Regions:
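Beta-strand/loop-rich accessory regions of lumenal/periplasmic or secreted enzymes
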Residues: 1-148
Length: 148
């Protein structure tokens, strides 16, 4: 979802506080607070960043505490999510951090699954098969959305 730029605060119950992926879950389960700007890792080459795994609920708010709460529906699996000042397209188009535009929106992703990132070493390690998402199998996401 594309949100107004002022909705940059993130509070969530999941694996954190740093970014986590299926193959990068060395984190504690807890309630964490951050914002989209702190969650964006300034890698030398802009790329996927800021994902959070095993999320039970997340609140995206403005400075007054108004916003959106996403929570897993009763009986549903935890989800993955991120809140970033850049879209996936913006990250793919930029070769360096200084090529990213000034943020005008926040980009909220809520995912049933997020593929692993690989990189067991620093030179082209692929994602291990157990962290792939099979394209021939159904995936479901069941969440509740509430205004706060």
């Amino acid at each position: 979802w594309t949100l107004l730029v002022q909705y940059s605060n993130l509070r969530f119950f999941g694996a954190g506080p740093e970014e986590t992926y299926q193959d990068r879950k060395h984190a504690k389960l807890g309630v964490w607070s951050t914002d989209a700007f702190k969650d964006h890792a300034p890698y030398l080459m802009p790329q996927e960043t800021g994902n959070h795994e095993d999320v039970r609920w997340a609140e995206i708010t403005d400075e007054k505490g108004h916003g959106l709460r996403i929570s897993r529906a009763e009986g549903a699996e935890p989800f993955a999510m991120s809140l970033q000042p850049y879209s996936s397209f913006m990250l793919e188009e930029a070769q360096h951090q200084d090529e990213l535009p000034a943020p005008k929106h926040m980009f909220l992703r809520v995912l049933a699954e997020q593929m692993g990132v690989g990189g067991d070493d620093s030179w082209m390690s692929p994602v291990h098969p157990q962290y792939h998402i099979p394209a021939d199998q159904p995936i479901s996401l069941d969440v509740d959305l509430d205004l706060i």
